[in-house]
Amino acid sequence: TAEAKFIRALSHYHVVRIWALPYGYTSDNSHLGIPLKVSADQTPQMRATVADVYAQIEQDLLDAEADLPASNGIFANQMAAKALLAKVYLEMGDFANAKAKAAEVMNSGTYSLDPVLTNRFADHANGNLPAEFIFTLVSTNESSATDTIVDERGMSFTWNYRSDDPNANPALKASQALYVEATADTNDLRGQLWYEARNAGTPDEFYVVSKFDGSFLDVPLLHLSDLYLIYAECNVRLNGDSDGSGLAKINALRQRAGLTDLTSLTLTDVMSERRLELAFEGDRLFQLKRQGILGEIQTIRGVDWDCPGMVLQFPNFEGT
């Protein structure tokens, strides 16, 4: 039951962020979210409010946190529930609880930051996962499709990024702005190892992403790098990072990327590191919308951050 509640919370969390405006869009979160699926009943349901959706997600995760085992192989464990709670609380603007849950996982001694930057999306031999992975969709190199688990993006996600063919022109590419930011510091391994300019210096120049060139990618839905970023942001927002503990987390990520340490930490620093560290992991849009809720940005690519185009529309046959 605890594993099922964790998966239900994870599913509701991903879906509500795609199909509804963010938490905080209305003062009481009475704006429409998604139909809540809490039973096997196939009867179409009306959309619940975002407040109700997040309340269900939080309760499912608190139940899972209490009942999941400390160790559970490749399946969800107690720390996975805590890690997802940290992400949910960050989305809700509950920075104190987000920081606390991130700290519980980081201080558990169960996980450690992988010293090799590229290991997060390398080929892992049948479940031999990096020490920073908290909850992962595991893929194998077996020929049977039933032996391979993929996330909601499916194989088309990684194949539309692949850059390991020199003649490749993938469907999904980096923007010029991101490429420039990622490669601005020539010591940054993220820029060196994850991007390549093709047709450089010509009008047809474009930028491929090499982050997902592995054949059997394990998809790290929850990992320690993200929690470092959550902790650092929350500490800045709560107390200006007065104790320097957020700075230490950001510098750990920077050191792994080959960069020198920062001497102080601002919110801009944290969000910049998040963009570079989690690029193309399905994170950026939701962070921008979260910053829109907080009044820190007004537009995304020239349009209002909360315009209808920033959420997917429900099909006509769905109860709305």
Each model region followed by its residue ranges:
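TPR-repeat structural position
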Residues: 54, 95, 241-243
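Alpha-helical solenoid scaffolds that mediate protein-protein interactions
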Residues: 15-16, 64, 71, 105-113, ...
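Aromatic-anchored glycine-rich loop motif in surface-exposed flexible loops
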Residues: 1-71, 245
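Hydrophobic-face positions in mid-chain alpha helices that act as interaction patches
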Residues: 99-224, 267, 277, 281-282, ...
